[in-house]
C-alpha cells in the first residue's frame, strides 16, 4: 500500500512538470485555477468502510472561467473530457463528496473490500499499449505521422486526450487512495476491438482492474495497437519489478523501458511487427481515454458500480441505502444488461430503466447536467444511465481507428428487430404496469403507517405475489425492470408519505361474523381507540346489522357489524334469518374481507361449530371462506395445562387452537385446501402496552397492526387481481382460471343405473305402467268375475238408512264397499283383456297388410289432436292465500303437436307470477314403427340458468327385444354435459328380462364412458326383484356402483294400492365405499292412506317420515297445532331463537 502511494506521488510530481510544457494541452493548468483548501470532515458513521469522505468546495469564479474555455476544450480534446467540464457538472452544488471503496486486507495480490474482491494493480497487469503524453515524443510523433500510417494516427488521436483531472487530484491529499488511483491508470479506449476478437486471441488479451470491455460500455481496455503484451509470464515479472523499484525515483522510466522490452520480446517470438506509440516517462500521469472519461477514484467507482453491483454503495448526500433484501435482484438485473452488451440497442428497455434511475437522481442535479455527464451530478458520483452508455459505445466505435467491429450488420439488424418487437407492445401493457406499480406504492405506504418493514412476512409475501402475478400476466416484457421496481416504489412511497400523508386513495370494508359474546364489537372499538358501539358482558348488544366507520392511521375503515350467531343445531333457523339480513345488506355495500371471530380460550374438541359454519356456507356460498381471516379474541388467556400436567407453551397453545378452527372451516366448506390466516386480539383494558402505546400480546407482538395489515393485504391483492384479470384471461393451460376437471362420476353413474321406460306407439299407451305386461298373461281366467256371482243388491234410500240400527248400517257399508271393490276389479280385468286382444290383432294385421295398421294408427292418433280439449290442472301446493291464482295455470291443448307449458316454481315466494322457465314436449313416430320423443326445459333466475334436454327413441327388432337410444344435455355446475346412451332389453325367460346398456358423457373437455347390466325377475304374482350394476370411467378415474330393489305388492294391487319397496345401493369411488338403504311402504287403514319412508347410510345419517291422508278423518287437522304452538313458545320464551333482552 505504501508503495502504491509513493507511485502516485511520483506521478503527481511528474505531472506538475509536464503540464506547462505539453504543446497539445489547450486547457488551463490545474495550478492556475484558484481553489479553496480541501475540507476534511470527521469520520462518517454511516460509511461502511470507515473512511473520511472528501468534500471539495468549488468557488464561484471557477465557473465563469470554465464556461469560457468549454468550447475550446471540445475542439481540442475531441471525444475527451476536461477538468473544466467536470467543474461544470458540479455547479449545482458547492460541495461534492465521495467515498471510494476501502481495501480491508490483501489476499493473494487482491484487495479485499466489504462486498467483494478487487484485483490489485500488480495482478491485473496492463491491458494493451499505454499512450504516454511525453511532450518531446509527441512532437516527433506528429512529424512522423505520415510514415506511421493508420496506427500512428490512432496514437495521435489518443495522445490528444488530456487529463486535467489528474492534475486536479494532485492538489488534493489522496494518498490514501493509491489503489483507486492506480486503477484509474488502466482506462483505455479499445472500442474498435470486439468481444469475439478478445476471445479468439487470448494470448494478446490483458486483464483489466475493472471488468473491461466485456462489462463496460465503450470499453475500459487499453488501445489495441500493441495487443500482444498479455501473457501471464511477463505479468508476474512485471509484478516483481513493481515491488522492487517502487521506491526508486526513476521508477517510471524503468517501468516504461521494461514494458517496451517485454512487449518487443513477446512480439519477436510471434514474428509480428508492432508499432509502439511514443511512451512518456510519467506512467501514472495523463492517460488517454474515450469520451466516458473518469476523473477520480470516485468517478471510476461510479462507472464500475454500473456493471458490478457487488461493490459497496458510496455514501453521499444524495445517495440512499438500498434495502438488503433486494440486493440480489439488482445484481441479477446488472448481469442481464451485461450479457446483452453487443447488440443492446433496445431504446425502450433502456428508457424504462433510465426512468427509475433518473427519478432517483432528480434531487441532486438538473436534467441538462445529467445528460452532460451521466456519472456525475451536483450531489456527487452516481450510477451512469445505461442508454447513455450505449450511445457512448457507438460513438467510440465509429471514431476510434476506422476498423469496423465484427458482426456489425447482424447486430444492427437484430437491434432493429428488437426495437420493432418492443414498439409493437400495446399501450395497455404499459398502463397495467404503471397501475400495478401504484398498487405497490400504496401497499408500502400502508405498511409504513403500520410500522411494518418490507422484511415482514406478510409484506414480503404480498410483494412476491404481485410480482408473480405480473410475470404471469405480462410475461418477460413486464419483468425486465423487476429489480428496480421495489427500490423505486419504496423511494416513492417514502416521498409520498413525507409530502402527502393524507393523500392516500385507499379504503377497506370489513364484514364481521361470529358467535355471540366473542368480542366483535369490542374489537371494533379497540381498532378505532374509541367507543363506536355499545358492548355488554351479560347480553348481546348488537341486535341488527349496522355499519361502523372511521379513520385509522389516515385510512378509512368501515366495519359491517352483525348480531351474534348461536352454535346450537336447534338455533340454525335463527342464524339463517340473521345471515339473510346480512346478505341483503352487503348487496348495497360489498365487503373486501370477512373476519370470523371466535374465542381463544374456548377449549372444544367436538364438532359443535360445524352446523353454524355450514349454515354460513349455505347462505353465502363456499367462496365466503376464500377471503376470510380467523380472529381469536381473549388472546392473553393463560395456556391450560397439557397432558402431562404442566402448562403448555403459549405458541403451542395458539397453534393448536388455530389448527382446530381452520380444520372446522375446511370441514364446513368441503375444501381441504383452505388455509385461512389467523390473527390474535386482546380487548381487555388491562392488556399490556409497549413503549409506543400499542397493545401487545404475551408474545410481544402488537395485534392491532397485524390485523389491519392482513385486511389491507387482502384488499391490495384483490385490486391487483381485478387489474390483471387473471381469472378472466387464464386458459386451461395456465395456472389460473378454469382447469380441466374430473367429471362427477358418482352423479353420472347414478344416472346410468336408473331404469328407463321403453317408448310405445300411440295406440299402446293405455296401460297402467310398464309392468302391466308382466302379469297380463298371469291373470286367472278360471276364477271368472266374482262380481257377476253376487246376488242382486238394492241400494237403500236415506230414510231407510235412518231406520236401521248402528250394526245394520255398518254391515250395509261393508257390503257396499265389497261390491265396489269387485266392480273395480272387473273393470281392470276387462281393460287387460281388451289390450291383449288389440295386441294380437295388431300382430296379425302387420303380417297380412303392413300399411293398414299404420294408416289406422295415424287416423286414431290424429283425431284427438283436431279437437281442442282442456288440459288437467297443474298440481299446486296447498296455500292459505286468499287470492290463490289457480286459474292462471289452466291451458288448452291445440292442434299443434308441440306442447309448450310454463314452469312454475312451487316453492317460490311469488304466488301470483311464479314462472321461472318453460317446458317443451313432443311425441312422434318415425317411419310408422319407431316411437320417439323430444322434451326440454329451461329455467332461469337472477344468478344461474339450468338447461335440460332429452331426446329418445325405441326400436323393436324381434319378439321381446327392444333397444332404447337417447341423447341428453344438462347443466352441471357452469358447464354443459352431453350424454349419448343406448340400452337393449330382451326376455330370457317368461318371468325374466335382462337389460344391457352403454353411455358416454362429454363434460369440460373430458369424456366419461360406462356400461351397465340389469336383470328383472318376477317371483309369483306379487314379488318383483330388480338387480343392476355398472362401472364408469373418465380421465383415469373409475366409479363402481350397483343397486338391489325388491317390491312386494298387495293381493289386489293396483286396486288396493298396497305396496312395499326395499332398496339397497352401493357405490365405490376413490376407495370410499358408500352404502345406503331405504324402505317405503304404503297401505290403507280404512279410508286413510298411510305412507312411511325411512333411509339410512353407512355414515350414520338417515331420515324417517310418516304421512297420512284422509277425506273422512277431519280431526287430523289438529296435528297442525303442534308447530304453531312451538313457534309461539319460541317467540315468547326464547327457546330456539334469539335470547330475550
Swiss-Prot record:
Mg(2+) binds at residue 521. It is found in: Plastid, Chloroplast outer membrane. InterPro entries: G_AIG1 (IPR006703), GIMA/IAN/Toc (IPR045058), P-loop_NTPase (IPR027417), TOC159_MAD (IPR024283), Toc86_159 (IPR005690). Its cofactor is Mg(2+). One of its GO terms (molecular function) is GTPase activity. GO terms for biological process: protein import into chloroplast stroma; protein targeting to chloroplast. Residues 57-72, 107-121 have a biased composition (Basic and acidic residues). Keywords: Chloroplast, GTP-binding, Hydrolase, Magnesium, Membrane, Metal-binding, Nucleotide-binding, Plastid, Plastid outer membrane, Protein transport, Transmembrane, Transmembrane helix, Transport. Residues 682-684 are annotated as: G5. Residues 514-521 are annotated as: G1. Residues 541-545 are annotated as: G2. Its EC number is 3.6.5.-. It comes from the Eukaryota. Residues 505-734 form the AIG1-type G domain. It is a single-pass membrane protein. Residues 832-841 have a biased composition (Basic residues). GTP binds at residues 517-522, 634, 682-683. Residues 561-564 are annotated as: G3. Residues 132-150, 328-353, 770-789 have a biased composition (Acidic residues). Residues 633-636 are annotated as: G4. GO terms for cellular component: chloroplast outer membrane. Binds 1 Mg(2+) ion by subunit. GTPase involved in protein precursor import into chloroplasts. Seems to recognize chloroplast-destined precursor proteins and regulate their presentation to the translocation channel through GTP hydrolysis. Probably specialized in the import of nuclear encoded non-photosynthetic preproteins from the cytoplasm to the chloroplast. Belongs to the TRAFAC class TrmE-Era-EngA-EngB-Septin-like GTPase superfamily. AIG1/Toc34/Toc159-like paraseptin GTPase family. TOC159 subfamily. PANTHER family: GTPASE, IMAP FAMILY MEMBER-RELATED (PTHR10903), TRANSLOCASE OF CHLOROPLAST 120, CHLOROPLASTIC-RELATED (PTHR10903:SF135). This is Translocase of chloroplast 125, chloroplastic. It comes from Physcomitrium patens (Spreading-leaved earth moss). The lineage of its organism: Eukaryota, Viridiplantae, Streptophyta, Embryophyta, Bryophyta.
